[in-house]
From Swiss-Prot:
Designated name of the protein: Ubiquinone biosynthesis protein COQ4 homolog, mitochondrial
Top-level taxon of the source organism: Eukaryota
Keyword entries, A-Z: Lyase, Membrane, Metal-binding, Mitochondrion, Mitochondrion inner membrane, Transit peptide, Ubiquinone biosynthesis, Zinc
Compartment(s) where it occurs, according to its Swiss-Prot or TrEMBL record: Mitochondrion inner membrane
Function text: Lyase that catalyzes the C1-decarboxylation of 4-hydroxy-3-methoxy-5-(all-trans-polyprenyl)benzoic acid into 2-methoxy-6-(all-trans-polyprenyl)phenol during ubiquinone biosynthesis.
UniProt EC number: 4.1.1.130
Assembly and interaction partners: Component of a multi-subunit COQ enzyme complex.
């Protein structure tokens, strides 16, 4: 049974779900007239995979088990986030709509990838700028903004964009927190995200990721990293409404102070 779960393939799972629904659901559609949808929403509605409540529960359970067995299965983690995060995404939507910056993001729906961001220009910014810090983070950790999986299982395209935005901003959060991508820091960043945005998958990754830490890492985690994440969460502003792309030239320490982020010591 465990070996079978380890071999779960998300593309194969997606095909199974799609084929089982074609006879009952037909092609994907929406009650909103196409002319009232923006480009992201139209594209998403053409590519999403519609699933029933039962299939959502099944996918959530299967992806959670597969994620626990193999934390490197990013496809399963992504699936888990989509099948369990709707209520949290609705709360994030409310938070974003409550701020001018957040509303602008929801209207413009910016994307973060190498087609939309000139990393060379960020590297040319002053060394104390947020844009430079982000470009340096990508280079130092051998990370690309093109690695995020597309959202597929959410019904509402507005929530699909918020989940997309969350995924594409993950490395920006690493950069502003000054946290590399090793396991200890990944768990810490997940705690910060979980306490900040409430997504169940973030809590799951934080809790079960910590279980996989080595003894020495776990001691450091309990003594320094986890208390730092919790303390920051008490004073940190919501991160999802931040239009990071408009902050490239801002001094990174000023941005941290604005957001209520206390540097890790």
């Amino acid at each position: 049974m465990m070996q079978q779960l380890r071999r779960i393939s998300l593309p194969r799972l997606q095909r199974h779900v799609t084929l089982s629904l074609l006879s009952r659901c037909g092609s994907t559609s929406t009650d909103v007239p196409p002319e009232e949808l923006d480009a992201f929403e139209r594209d998403y509605l053409q590519q999403r995979i519609q699933i029933t409540t039962f299939q959502r529960l099944l996918l959530g359970a299967g992806s959670s088990i597969a994620s626990l067995l193999n934390p490197h299965r990013h496809d399963m983690i992504a699936c888990l986030g989509e099948t369990t995060g709707e209520n949290a995404l609705l709360n994030i939507l409310d938070t974003m709509q409550a701020s001018e910056e957040g509303r602008r993001i929801l209207v413009e729906k910016p994307r973060i990838n190498t087609k939309t961001i000139d990393l060379k220009s960020l590297e040319a910014l002053p060394s104390d700028s947020f844009g430079f810090a982000y470009a340096k983070f990508l280079k130092d950790n051998n990370v690309t903004p093109d690695s995020r999986m597309e959202v597929r299982f959410l019904e509402d395209p507005k929530l699909a964009y918020i989940m997309t935005r969350y995924r594409e901003c993950h490395d920006l959060v690493h950069a502003v927190l000054d946290m590399p991508t090793n396991m200890l820091c990944e768990v810490t960043v997940k705690w910060v995200e979980a306490l900040n945005n409430g997504l169940p998958m973030c809590y799951g990754a934080a809790v079960f990721g910590a279980v996989r830490l080595r003894p020495r890492q776990r001691r450091e985690y309990l003594k320094r990293y986890l208390p730092w994440a919790i303390e920051n969460s008490k004073q940190m502003k919501p991160l999802m409404p931040i239009y990071w792309e408009k902050r490239w030239e801002q001094k990174v320490n000023d941005l941290r102070a604005e957001l209520g982020i206390k540097p890790f010591q």
